[in-house]
């Protein structure tokens, strides 16, 4: 039960709040708002902020673009009620300057309150990363009605597999960069107990990483079912790999078409996937399974982190809002060699990854193509954007096969301010 674990959080959470309302009420009823979040005790510094300001002159990430010396001076002594500081938020971006041609985010949250206590930095980073979405004035919309999707079956001569994923965080527990071992184990316990209530085609079982052989783990990784140990410097610098593989694992249904990763980059990653090009069926299963998981979580006195400005709260600002990434593995041997390919993707608000995901190379001209944005558009809108965009890429590939010319599409409109 939530109330049992809450006592162990008293050193990190507001003991008075827990004592007054109880952990169950806290988990079920805490609505995050700027006027209700107070920072923790100010940090005592030996040197002035100007002496502590990081050298960001060669950095190419959103954090570095927005963190001025003045903002650093105003925020560097603040902390969330958990004690999470600005320097902890930005350390991964300081340590990892980014790629000259690929702009990363460069910062993470340690808890739900991070986005409020350090809003002066997070808000402009969010606006830059999410195509102009202004968290100060805009509200996020959720829509999990899969019946609204149109033209959701791709030509399988090009599309090899389809996948939709999102992340969800358990309210009242710190996010992976900041969580204690006890909190991480509680995330696992709460989630697995809820997942055991799934029935029908969603029913399955949980597999702990610590109980798998290396061969079993590698096979699941090779089949694109399981996450690998975080070895990326941006993840390790953020503290994602601490205590590995304690309290990490994968839950999947019997058909391995509905999966939940536990305690990787986020508390949970919910995934619907299958071979072939039936994105509409993948999204329908995703919506149905996600709604059922949330219902089962709430039955146990917990809930997901959410607010109307930022949508669902996750570790990286790039995943706020829907947290949704709808993607395909697609063969594009001709288009991928065309100099216009990057601009086409940019205008369609799509991103390209290697066959094995982020930081991997494309194998046999197979790319992982997915939506770039997460926030400010609903799940239905983003999946439809991917469907329309992937169909455009397929049309370009067909035209190139016939020796015909292709054109760069008009950019997807940015948000209105």
From Swiss-Prot:
Chief location: mitochondrion
UniProt keyword terms in alphabetical order: ATP-binding, Kinase, Membrane, Mitochondrion, Mitochondrion inner membrane, Nucleotide-binding, Transferase, Transit peptide
Transit peptide residue numbers: 1-39
Function according to Swiss-Prot or TrEMBL: Reversibly catalyzes the transfer of phosphate between ATP and various phosphogens (e.g. creatine phosphate). Creatine kinase isoenzymes play a central role in energy transduction in tissues with large, fluctuating energy demands, such as skeletal muscle, heart, brain and spermatozoa.
A GO BP annotation: phosphocreatine biosynthetic process
Record-listed E.C. numbers: 2.7.3.2
Subcellular location as annotated: Mitochondrion inner membrane
Gene Ontology CC annotation, any one: mitochondrion
UniProt: ATP binding residues: 161-165, 224, 269, 325, 353-358, 368
Record membrane topology: Peripheral membrane protein
Subunit structure: Exists as an octamer composed of four MTCK homodimers.
PANTHER family: ARGININE OR CREATINE KINASE, CREATINE KINASE U-TYPE, MITOCHONDRIAL
More info: Mitochondrial creatine kinase binds cardiolipin.
Domain Phosphagen kinase C-terminal: 158-400
Single GO molecular function: ATP binding
Domain Phosphagen kinase N-terminal residue range list: 44-131
Pfam families reported in the protein's UniProt record: ATP-gua_Ptrans, ATP-gua_PtransN
Recorded family membership: Belongs to the ATP:guanido phosphotransferase family.
Enzyme type, top EC level: transferase
Catalytic reaction equation(s): creatine + ATP = N-phosphocreatine + ADP + H(+)
Species of origin: Gallus gallus
UniProt-recorded name of the protein: Creatine kinase U-type, mitochondrial
Tissue: Highly expressed in brain and gut, weakly in testis. Also found in cell bodies of neural cells of the gray matter.
């Amino acid at each position: 039960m939530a109330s049992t674990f809450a006592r162990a959080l008293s050193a990190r959470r507001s003991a008075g709040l827990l004592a007054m309302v109880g952990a169950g009420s806290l988990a079920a009823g805490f609505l995050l708002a700027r006027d209700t979040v107070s920072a923790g005790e100010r940090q005592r510094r030996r040197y002035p902020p100007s002496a502590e300001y990081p050298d960001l002159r060669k950095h190419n990430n959103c954090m570095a673009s927005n963190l001025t010396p003045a903002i650093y001076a105003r925020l560097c002594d603040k902390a969330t009620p958990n004690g999470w500081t600005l320097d902890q938020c930005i350390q991964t971006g300081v340590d990892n300057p980014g790629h000259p041609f690929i702009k990363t985010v460069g910062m993470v949250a340690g808890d739900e309150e991070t986005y409020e206590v350090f809003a002066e930095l997070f808000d402009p980073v969010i606006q830059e990363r999410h195509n102009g979405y202004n968290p100060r004035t805009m509200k996020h919309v959720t829509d999990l009605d899969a019946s609204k999707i149109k033209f959701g079956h791709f030509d399988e001569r090009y599309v090899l597999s389809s996948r939709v994923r999102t992340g969800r965080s358990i309210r009242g527990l710190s996010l992976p960069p900041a969580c204690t071992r006890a909190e991480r184990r509680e995330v696992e316990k709460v989630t697995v107990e809820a997942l055991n209530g799934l029935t029908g085609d969603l029913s399955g079982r949980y597999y702990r990483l610590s109980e798998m052989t290396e061969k079993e783990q590698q096979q699941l990784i090779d089949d694109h079912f399981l996450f690998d140990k975080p070895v990326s410097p941006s993840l390790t610098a953020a503290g994602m790999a601490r205590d590995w593989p304690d309290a990490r694992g994968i839950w999947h249904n019997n058909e391995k078409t509905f999966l939940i990763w536990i305690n990787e980059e986020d508390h949970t990653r919910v995934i619907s996937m299958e071979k072939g090009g039936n994105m509409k069926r993948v999204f329908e299963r995703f919506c149905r399974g996600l709604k059922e998981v949330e219902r089962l979580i709430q039955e146990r006195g917990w809930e997901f982190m959410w607010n109307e400005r930022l949508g669902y709260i996750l570790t990286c600002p790039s995943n706020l809002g829907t947290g949704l990434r709808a993607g395909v593995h697609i063969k594009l041997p001709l288009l991928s060699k065309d100099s216009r390919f990057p601009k086409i993707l940019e205008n369609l608000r799509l991103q390209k990854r290697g066959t094995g995901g982020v930081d991997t190379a494309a194998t046999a001209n197979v790319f992982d193509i997915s939506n770039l944005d997460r926030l400010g558009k609903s799940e239905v809108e983003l999946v439809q954007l991917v469907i329309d965009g992937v169909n455009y890429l397929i049309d370009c590939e067909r035209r190139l096969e016939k020796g015909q010319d292709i054109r760069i599409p008009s950019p997807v409109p940015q948000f209105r301010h």
